[in-house]
Amino acid sequence: MASSSSSNSFGGVAGVNGDLWRECVAWLTRCKVIPPDHKAAQPDAEIRILAMTLRDGVLLCNLVIHLDPSSLDPREFNRKPQMAQFLCSKNIKLFLDVCHNNFGIRDADLFEPTMLYDLTNFHRVLITLSKLSQCRKVQQLHPDLIGFNLQLSPTERSHSDEAIYKDLHSTTTDNIACNGTGYDHTNTKEEEVYQDLCALHRTSRSQTASSTSFEQRDYVIRELIDTESNYLDVLTALKTKFMGPLERHLNQDELRLIFPRIRELVDIHTKFLDKLRESLTPNAKVKMAQVFLDFREPFLIYGEFCSLLLGAIDYLADVCKKNQIIDQLVQKCERDYNVGKLQLRDILSVPMQRILKYHLLLDKLVKETSPLHDDYRSLERAKEAMIDVSQYINEVKRDSDHLVIIQKVKDSICDIHLLQNGNGSDLLQYGRLLLDGELHIKAHEDQKTKLRYAFVFDKILIMVKALHIKTGDMQYTYRDSHNLADYRVEQSHSRRTIGRDTRFKYQLLLARKSGKTAFTLYLKSEHERDKWRKALTEAMESLEPPGCQSTDHKMEIYTFDAPTTCRHCSKFLKGRIHQGYRCKVCQISVHKGCISSTGRCKQNPVSVPPPVCDRQLSEFNWFAGNMDRETAAHRLENRRIGTYLLRVRPQGPSTAHETMYALSLKTDDNVIKHMKINQENSGDSMLYCLSSRRHFKTIVELVSYYERNDLGENFAGLNQSLQWPYKEVIATALYDYEPKAGSNQLQLRTDCQVLVIGKDGDSKGWWRGKIGDTVGYFPKEYVQEQKLASEEL
């Protein structure tokens, strides 16, 4: 029988035992702390999902607040502990304290905090919840709320439970979705609010279909424009119908706390909607995709908004609770806005929902756009840009929550000032908290094993000792710290060790690279040991990324104060803590995964004068300066076939045979061709080429040659020359000019137009131009410049 029970441990064990955890889920659903469609409530759900949902203690604290709002101040527990053990344990302790003091649950019916966090005895957790569901106070406060009962015989507990919960502990890992906050429910509600306020109504779409012959692509464009208009109405309402009336009762600081960056969002989206509508007009100068690309950076303000949103809702609730006039005014504003159907706290969530919709709307538009359509490639880039923005916002929000955790770590260590590393007590310099927990440690020069609580950050391992711990409180005294850059992790022998505390049996060796000292860490299980080894190894790898072996850049993990893009891929470095890496020499900034592609380090590769030309490249209209592939493609995609530019590659050369330069050309098959310029050492001089077929003394000579000859000798099938510089200066001839026979000069006729290719001979009175297919020099005094074509065309 035990074998049969064990085999069904997560899908539902036979008998009462198999139903117990599902009955607990059903009760939590009746309490409305998890929604009916929660993962744990699905028919194929496993018990581990419930365990991980409860593990951080957030849902448990929300549960007792739901059962009795006076039992716990919501500000006392950590709503986003991000699985930091000391914060999760604090939440669990608070829950147990409320169960005992407020609901009268006996100590014998309470579980120990480690039983839940370590998942060593989840059965006891279910017992506590069962007792809570049936206690007298809950029945008095919620007479219609049916609890759940636990009735197991000793035989069933000794066989079924032991097998189930041992298996639960050994198989449940930290990468399972584990938030017990009811976020799924919150997100569902926020999505419903967004749909109610911003989404297109079906009647509107059907009316359009009945009156106009629209393609599916047109529907998607209309959905984007109309939902944006609806969203701007929501922002405007927040500003005028809520902030406006409240201005008479709250000061500006209080308004900023409740309505973070709302005024700025109104301004941004007013301009954004105008640009979107303008992009749909005939002969529009800027297309829709470019509008999204242009607003890529302004949209980063949502990182701050989303980070402040939860605090805004809390502050609003606190103000309304303390001030009846404010509370009544807010309710009046809600009635005036939408007949009271939605609360202000619900409406405040709409901006976060909207910013995360843009890449989805663009994805729909891309799918409804033919790959042969002129806008296809630019729409794909716009979609990728909005995905990048969404990821940036999510990481800023996550790191903002993490900064709170770091501050709580600092507050929990009473003498953190004893740290002797870096700036002492400023924990922010050490990066994110990767792992924390209890372990034993033994220095090899000191045979005494010590019980410690440890915090692993990106850069440092901090050892503390627990002080007298009250329920719901965690305080430590500082003992030691180790810069992880000085260490490596080694697996000690795999045999379990037996000491005075038999809980800590599994070893991990932390050895100094200098070989002078080493420490042995003792953990409770193989799973714990593997978790600590992984955290320490990842931290050390982040300090010395493998990609650094492929370049001579002096990279260091770095926290950037302002939004920064990666020099290699041009995407944002995301978050607020250690977003990426910066070279200590040339200051370029990159993602960890892009380090190996950064090429050779130069003190300042952009400002160094081009070493390959006998004249300044900036004198030529085809020279674009520092520019990545994506930007070059955007500059050229809507230009005529044969338009080209020479650019400095931001990442620099990746091999000794590459230069920092590349040509980008719009070809006759409507594709942007990017061509690296290579170099070869020829005795005392350097030669430049696109391939080994032909070499030139300067890059100017190379460009000049391929202006007159196609590139097919280097690239099979590319029967295209460099025809039109991307900066087009048009000049009109004022006089006739007849060049000498056999010279490299242009013939001019009064009023004829010349495309000015370059002004490299300006000091001598000559410009270089093109008329038709003929390229040559002409006297600059014989012409008058007309216009400079926009680089954005």
UniProtKB/Swiss-Prot annotation:
GO terms for biological process: actin cytoskeleton organization; axon guidance; axonogenesis; border follicle cell migration; cell migration; central nervous system development; compound eye morphogenesis; dorsal closure. Keywords: Guanine-nucleotide releasing factor, Metal-binding, Phosphoprotein, Repeat, SH2 domain, SH3 domain, Zinc, Zinc-finger. This is Protein vav. A zinc finger (Phorbol-ester/DAG-type) spans 552-601. Residues 622-726 form the SH2 domain. InterPro entries: CH_dom, CH_dom_sf, DBL_dom_sf, DH_dom, PE/DAG-bd, PH-like_dom_sf, PH_domain, PH_Vav. Phosphorylated on tyrosine residues. SMART domains: C1, CH, PH, RhoGEF, SH2, SH3. GO terms for molecular function: guanyl-nucleotide exchange factor activity; zinc ion binding. Residues 432-541 form the PH domain. It holds the Pfam family RhoGEF. Couples tyrosine kinase signals with the activation of the Rho/Rac GTPases. Probably plays a pivotal role as a signal transducer protein during fruit fly development. Ubiquitous. Interacts (via SH2 domain) with Egfr (when phosphorylated on tyrosine residues). It comes from Drosophila melanogaster. Residues 216-396 form the DH domain. Residues 726-788 form the SH3 domain. Residues 18-137 form the Calponin-homology (CH) domain. PANTHER family: PROTEIN VAV. GO terms for cellular component: cytoplasm; cytosol.
